[in-house]
Amino acid sequence: MRLFKDHVEKLLGQPMVMIYKPGAAGVIAGAYVKESKPDGYTFFVISNTSLVSSMVTRKADFTLDDFTPICTLTLSPIIFAVKKDSPYKTFKDFTEAATTKKLKYGTTAALSATQLIVEAIGRQEGFQAIHVPIAGGAKAMATVLGGHVDMAGVSPTGIESQLRILAVVLQNRWEAYPDVPTLKELGYPIGPEVYFSLYAPKGTPKEIVDRIHGAYTRVLAEHREEITKRAKGINQIARVLGPEELGKMSRDSYDFVKTMVSKIQAPVN
């Protein structure tokens, strides 16, 4: 949201105050927004995957129906990476090895969408790797470098030059790593892309939704070079998609997470 903030404030003639409600993977912030008036003054910035994961795995006191989707802001690629001297040169090398030995992989949280993607691939390919939850992307990468896990699936953190990236979770190849295939290319059209997005309380009028969505669309169009460069600096891709697309993406993400959690019969915290 910071990428757009100054320009959106000028366009709307309204200051934007960012209130942090940390804790419980978005549950506290989500509850706050759910109880807010649908007057166009309170919004919820969270990734689609974190939002639905909090509903499925953390007993959140809200559902998708409690929010009005506004638009996406940035796409956050997920990469699967190994040590540069790893025997696994490709993602297929990893999946094939995982069918004959117990390999370990790390993600930033138990029951994260990234873990569920690997679980889904394991069911497709006939393996069950050992999941290691690690607090934070940088620590996960360091855990790979230290040889404590065989692979990590995380958002880029800036130390990718020390690793070998095997695959990326995107619909199309990432400009930052054009030689790295997507999971979709490799035959795994599995799991949601991760978008940091803007949601409003349920009942927010359409004219407000359209105005806010329009403001972000216009700001990206008029300041594309600046915002794209800043997004690249934090390993994200600036992309504004509208309420219909965000709504469908959120529902699809929810269905994927709920289905996979049910399949692995994971305990709900």
How does the language model describe each region?
Residues M18:
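Short conserved active-site loop signatures built around small residues
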Residues M1-F4, P22-A24, G106-S112:
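Extracytoplasmic "Venus flytrap"
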Residues G40-F44, I79, D150-M151, I165:
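Short, Asp-centered acidic motifs that coordinate Mg2+ and/or phosphate
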Residues K104-V180:
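Ligand-binding pocket segment of bilobal, Venus flytrap-like solute-binding proteins
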Residues L75, S155-I227, D252-D255, M260, ...:
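C-terminal lobe and pocket-closing loops
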Residues V8-K10, E35-Y41, M55-A135, E193-R230:
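Hinge/capping helix and adjacent helix->loop/strand transition within the periplasmic-binding protein
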Residues K21-A29, L75, H131-G146, E244:
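Short helix-initiation/N-cap motifs at beta->coil->alpha
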Residues R218, R224-G247:
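Mature extracytoplasmic/periplasmic domains
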